[in-house]
């Protein structure tokens, strides 16, 4: 005889392997707080609608509060044979308050229950991530403001391209994280509809008040279609998509930290707080925090891929496949939280080698574009012609193994007689960055303005 809560029509217990593959309590116990909150709101609504007696609803609420305290104190025993968080909570509720516990599941299915729990959990996760990302932006903007005029090489193809400032480079990530926060906020807006009351798939014949439960749980409204409500996992996929893009951004930053801290570049230093040593090479200082930020992006992207593949072939409405929606998501959310925290820590810890940065910024003829721009402005030469002239001058300097500013005026006039002594005023990396005053440019004045604007927006006093 089956003793499962769903076992009325079953005459024997499930096989041990069936219990093992069917159970989700090993991971969905994370939903305990959301499950209890949803059940309390549901019980209160049932009483308000006269579907259950007020005293039963009160006993249910008291019992659920006791269970919450037990779980948070570590005194609750989760049982695999009860499958999931819903049955574990309901079983314990029955032990605490007796028959009244059986009233709780009136007008409700585990299908709408888990959909509600998971939305609440993802919403809580989104709120926590947004706060973390705002802190990362503060760290970036503060460091950018401090280094608005610190010259460093800007790269394309990982080859020195033009001088920029360290502050400008960091502010690029402030903008990326702003888009990440926007995507996560958009996901939260679409998530914030309440499935509770959709029951298994078709709704319920009981006179429930779905608006009341939606409001009690902080949702904007109840979901409009019961089939969609119990079979929808868009909110997980969308959140994981935004999380994956965010992880890619932070992976790119981490890759740069790995490169910059390499002795071959030596542009920045991380302290002992965010590096580790080698078990055999005593001189090593390894940027493990950055490397793990980079690696965890793969786990987060993997979770997105996993749920997309799980959901791609499911007919409406619920199928047990959807139990696989949580474990990867939980892992990805935890990973992203750690990635954001580690990134903020590294930003605050990182110290640029300003002299080496400025020297590196001048390598690779990085002011060649400034030379071409000067030819256009000062001599009214069309840019394409100026580009060609500059290329010849760079070739001359390269052949001699010297920097552009080491060429003589005669050398340059040998390429084009129109060039004057004023050309040397634009060949300094410091002058180069100061000249990039267009909106969004690397000029220190622009970087300071942008950093201060963001810090004000993020609530940091001037």
Swiss-Prot record:
GO molecular function (one): argininosuccinate lyase activity
EC number in record: 4.3.2.1
NCBIfam families according to UniProt: argH
InterPro entries tied to this protein: Arg_succ_lyase_C, Argininosuccinate_lyase, Fumarase/histidase_N, Fumarate_lyase_CS, Fumarate_lyase_fam, Fumarate_lyase_N, L-Aspartase-like
Keywords, in A-Z order: Amino-acid biosynthesis, Arginine biosynthesis, Cytoplasm, Lyase
Enzyme class: lyase
Single GO cellular component term: cytosol
GO biological process: arginine biosynthetic process via ornithine; L-arginine biosynthetic process
Record pathway: Amino-acid biosynthesis; L-arginine biosynthesis; L-arginine from L-ornithine and carbamoyl phosphate: step 3/3
Protein name according to UniProt: Argininosuccinate lyase
Location of this chain's protein in the cell: Cytoplasm
Classification via Pfam families: ASL_C2, Lyase_1
Catalytic activity: 2-(N(omega)-L-arginino)succinate = fumarate + L-arginine
Chief site of localization: cytoplasm
Domain of life: Bacteria
HAMAP family in UniProt: Arg_succ_lyase (MF_00006)
């Amino acid at each position: 005889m089956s003793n499962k809560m769903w076992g009325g029509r079953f005459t024997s217990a499930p096989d041990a392997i069936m219990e093992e593959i069917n159970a989700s309590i090993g991971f969905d116990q994370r939903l305990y707080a959301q499950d209890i909150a949803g059940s309390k709101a549901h019980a209160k609504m049932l009483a308000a609608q006269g579907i259950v007696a007020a005293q039963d609803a009160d006993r249910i609420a008291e019992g659920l509060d006791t269970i919450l305290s037990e779980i948070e104190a570590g005194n609750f025993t989760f049982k695999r044979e009860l499958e999931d968080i819903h049955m574990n909570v309901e079983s314990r509720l029955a032990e605490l308050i007796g028959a009244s516990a059986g009233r709780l599941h009136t007008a409700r299915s585990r299908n709408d229950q888990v959909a509600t729990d998971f939305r609440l959990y993802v919403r809580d996760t989104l709120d926590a991530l947004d706060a973390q990302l705002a802190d990362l932006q503060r760290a970036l903007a503060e460091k950018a403001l401090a280094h608005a005029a610190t010259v460093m090489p800007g790269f394309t193809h990982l080859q020195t391209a033009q001088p920029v400032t360290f502050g400008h480079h960091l502010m690029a990530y402030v903008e990326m994280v702003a888009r990440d926060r926007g995507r996560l906020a958009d996901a939260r807006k679409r998530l914030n509809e309440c499935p509770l009351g959709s029951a298994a798939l078709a709704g319920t014949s009981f006179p429930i008040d779905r608006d009341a439960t939606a409001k009690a749980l902080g949702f904007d409204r109840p979901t409009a279609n019961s089939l969609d409500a119990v079979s929808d996992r868009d909110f997980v996929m969308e959140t994981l998509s935004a999380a994956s893009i965010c992880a890619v951004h932070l992976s790119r930053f981490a890759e740069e930290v790995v490169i910059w801290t390499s002795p071959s570049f030596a542009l920045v230093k991380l302290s002992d707080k965010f590096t580790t040593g080698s078990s055999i090479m005593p001189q090593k200082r390894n940027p493990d925090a950055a490397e793990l930020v980079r690696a965890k992006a793969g786990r987060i992207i993997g979770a997105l891929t996993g749920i997309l593949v799980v959901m791609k072939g499911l007919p409406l409405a619920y199928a047990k496949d959807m139990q696989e929606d949580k474990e990867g998501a939980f892992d990805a959310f935890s990973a992203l939280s750690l990635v954001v925290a580690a990134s903020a820590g590294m930003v605050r810890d990182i110290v640029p080698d300003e002299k080496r940065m400025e020297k590196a910024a001048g390598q690779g003829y990085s002011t060649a574009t400034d030379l071409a721009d000067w030819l256009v402005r000062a001599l009214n030469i069309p840019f394409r012609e100026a580009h060609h002239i500059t290329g010849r001058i760079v070739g001359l300097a390269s052949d001699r193994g010297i920097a552009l500013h080491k060429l003589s005026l005669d050398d340059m006039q040998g390429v084009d007689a129109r060039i004057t002594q004023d050309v040397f005023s634009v060949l300094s990396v410091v002058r180069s960055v100061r000249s990039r005053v267009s909106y969004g440019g690397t000029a220190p004045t622009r970087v300071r303005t942008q950093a201060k604007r963001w810090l004000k927006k993020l609530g940091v006093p001037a």
